[in-house]
C-alpha cells in the first residue's frame, strides 16, 4: 500500500509538483511539496487522496472509504519553519518507534532510495498531512 501511495506522490510531478520531503505512516502521511500556481494545494491533496483511493480500490480490492475527510496544510514561510517541518517529517517514524533512525524507515524521504526535488529559496512550499 505504501508503494502505491508513493507512486501517486511521484505521479503528481507530471503536473509540476515538486516533492521535497514525505513520510508514509501506517495510518497517515506527511508531504512537503511545492505546488505550481495552476494547481491549488487543495486540488493537490484531492489528487493524492483521490488518486490513491481509486487505485487502491481497483488494484488492491479496497471497498468503502479509504481516507478520513479533510487534511491539514500549512504554507511554509520561513527557513526556520522549513527546517522544523523537514525534521518533523523525517523523525515521525522514529518518534513512533517504527525505526531507530529516520534513514531506516522504508517509506520516508530520509531513506536514500527516493529522489527528492530541490527547494528553491523563492519557492512557496506547503506542508500537508492527512489521515
Describe the residue ranges of each PLM region.
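Short catalytic/metal-binding and nucleic-acid-binding patches
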Residues: 1-131
Amino acid at each position: 500500500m505504501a508503494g502505491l501511495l508513493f507512486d501517486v506522490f511521484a505521479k503528481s510531478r507530471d503536473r509540476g509538483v515538486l516533492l521535497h520531503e514525505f513520510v508514509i505512516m501506517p495510518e497517515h502521511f506527511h508531504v512537503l511539496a511545492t505546488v505550481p500556481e495552476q494547481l491549488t494545494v487543495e486540488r493537490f491533496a484531492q489528487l493524492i487522496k483521490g488518486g490513491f483511493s481509486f487505485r487502491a480500490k481497483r488494484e488492491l480490492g479496497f471497498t468503502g472509504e479509504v481516507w478520513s475527510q479533510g487534511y491539514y496544510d500549512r504554507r511554509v514561510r520561513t527557513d526556520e519553519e522549513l527546517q522544523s517541518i523537514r525534521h518533523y517529517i523525517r523523525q515521525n517514524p522514529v518518534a513512533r518507534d517504527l525505526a531507530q533512525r529516520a534513514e531506516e524507515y522504508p517509506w520516508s524521504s530520509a531513506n536514500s532510495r527516493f529522489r527528492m526535488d530541490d527547494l528553491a529559496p523563492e519557492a512557496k512550499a506547503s506542508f500537508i498531512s492527512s489521515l
